Amino acid sequence: MLMPKRTKFRKQQKGQFAGLSKGATFVDFGEYAMQTLERGWVTSRQIEACRVAINRYLKRRGKVWIRIFPDKSVTKKPAETRMGKGKGAPDHWVAVVRPGRILFEVANVSKEDAQDALRRAAAKLGIKTRFVKRVERV
């Protein structure tokens, strides 16, 4: 699972989802990519499941880049615990994604293979995504 090596604070506030993605909106490394259409949290387990799905489909062909990192801790209180008594312990890590964010990039494979691999990975996520290809920027 992906998680930060160390953080300044163990617990974080929920934060806001408003607006579009501020960075990583273009295909910079590969030829094809998966781009978000919705906002939400992507957990480190979902990222790992997507990575495994892409790699299993491509079978050592091509190269894969993961463009998101789960750097936000999500806390959870134990089951059957009364309210109050402070915030719960850190439970898992998530990456905050907004519309337009590139999640995964693929290179050195055909368009059909890239589409199939990224479609299989998109099924592991709880947000809508689309397939995009690289466009030359000036």
Curated annotation (Swiss-Prot):
GO molecular function, one term: tRNA binding
CDD domains from the UniProt entry: Ribosomal_L16_L10e
Keywords carried by this UniProt record: Ribonucleoprotein, Ribosomal protein, RNA-binding, rRNA-binding, tRNA-binding
PROSITE patterns recorded: RIBOSOMAL_L16_1, RIBOSOMAL_L16_2
InterPro entries per UniProt: Ribosomal_uL16, Ribosomal_uL16_bact-type, Ribosomal_uL16_CS, Ribosomal_uL16_dom, Ribosomal_uL16_sf
Pfam families found in the cross-reference section: Ribosomal_L16 (PF00252)
GO cellular component: cytosolic large ribosomal subunit
GO biological process, one term: translation
Role this protein plays: Binds 23S rRNA and is also seen to make contacts with the A and possibly P site tRNAs.
NCBIfam families: rplP_bact
Quaternary context: Part of the 50S ribosomal subunit.
Family: Belongs to the universal ribosomal protein uL16 family.
Protein name: Large ribosomal subunit protein uL16
The species this protein was found in: Chlamydia pneumoniae (Chlamydophila pneumoniae)
Taxonomic path: Bacteria, Pseudomonadati, Chlamydiota, Chlamydiia, Chlamydiales
